[in-house]
Amino acid sequence: MRGMGNMQGMMKQMQKMQKEMAKAQADLEVQEFTGTAGGGMVTVKATGKRVITDVVINEEVVDPEDIEMLQDLVLAATNDVLKQIEDTTSQTMGKFTQGLNLPGM
């Protein structure tokens, strides 16, 4: 019967961890991230749900003769913000799986 008490304790611990993970995920989804390129000439903001909420382009980089550079800056700023979201998500959610030795995690 001692094994049953241990199993119940483990189940409670898992349920608690699931709740904490859900809260962490919800917090990440509403967090705002900012990516930049060109020394801040282009800024892209997004939520943790990877929804772009704002794009700001400094007028100094708008050159009708060099649209390609502007496109590259927007792309770089977008990739920067997405990487920040990915890194923060991995770091935050990794705290829950650390030390569990789960296959594939």
Swiss-Prot record:
Keywords: Cytoplasm, DNA-binding. One of its GO terms (molecular function) is DNA binding. One of its GO terms (cellular component) is bacterial nucleoid. It is found in: Cytoplasm, Nucleoid. InterPro entries: YbaB-like_sf, YbaB/EbfC. Binds to DNA and alters its conformation. May be involved in regulation of gene expression, nucleoid organization and DNA protection. Homodimer. This is Nucleoid-associated protein lwe2654. It comes from Listeria welshimeri serovar 6b (strain ATCC 35897 / DSM 20650 / CCUG 15529 / CIP 8149 / NCTC 11857 / SLCC 5334 / V8).
